[in-house]
Every structure is written in C-alpha cells, then in structure tokens.
Swiss-Prot record:
Keywords: Cytoplasm, Glycosyltransferase, Purine salvage, Transferase. GO terms for molecular function: adenine binding; adenine phosphoribosyltransferase activity; AMP binding. Signal peptide: none annotated. This is Adenine phosphoribosyltransferase. The gene is apt. The keyword Glycosyltransferase applies. Belongs to the purine/pyrimidine phosphoribosyltransferase family. It comes from the Archaea.
Amino acid sequence: MDLEAMLASYPDFPKKGVLFKDIGPILRDPAALAWAADELLRRYPPADFDVIAGIESRGFILATIMSARSGKGMVMIRKPGKLPGKTVKLAYKTEYGEDILEAQHGSVKSGERVIICDDLLATGGTAAAAASLVEQVGGKVAGLAFIVELAKLCGADKIAGYNRKSLVVY
C-alpha cells in the first residue's frame, strides 16, 4: 500500500520552516491503518516482544491496533500529569525546549521486551526519551516502530543503538 501518497503536508506548521507530515488521511482509511499495523507486526513478529508501548498521542493509535492484533498488552507513555497512581518520569530536550514523559510504575515488568510506537520519527528526542524510560522501569527495548521517518532531521542518530522500522522515509 502506498502510504506516502496518502500523507498530507502542511508547510510552516507548527512553526515556520517545518513541513508537517500528517497521518490523518491514513487514520481515516481503515484499510490503510490496518495495513500499517499489520506491516509493522510483520517486521516485528509477536514472538519477538512482550508488550507494546505507545507514545502520546498518535502513537497510542498504532500501538492499540498492534496490541489487539498481536495479543500483547499495551502501555501508555504520556505527558506529565495524565496517568493515575505512581509514575516514573523522564525529562528530555526537544527542538522546542524541554519536556517530560511518564509511564505508570509497574506497567512494564523487569526484563519485558518492548516495542515502542509513534506516528513519526523527526529529531528523535521523544523516541530516545521513551526508550530510556522503558529501560529505566526495567524493560528492554525490542524496537521502535513509526509510520513516518523524516531522515533529514537525523532522528535515527539519537536511537542508533536500537532497532527501528519506519514504513515511509522522507
């Protein structure tokens, strides 16, 4: 399936000089969305991981579908203050400043192999922080899965120590 042809582009969003790649058209097409999840599961067979983590917010969509299709649990990696109970936090730098990611304490068990999902890999800051957070709570990063990768932003460099799979690379 040609996901690249389905992506919408928005220049100067969210700030001047950025060409935003929107997965919205893929989300609106159930066949394309199912294909994307299935293709990533083909690249990361369920025997190779124990749980899937989705990064807020568009990573939740892909992770939920992959979780249901693989029969594996799904963990949310969220912005601060969005998860109940005890959480583990990790601060990291972004291209816009600094941010924090959280996961619920105990959501990833020690030694579990985790696939981390997000819609897009750009500078790699969020993906690297999510990987560090998974490791901080005792998990092992089995891989990172993206619908889109913006190669010119060199995000892959920040997660070079991990296996990554992207369906569309610009």
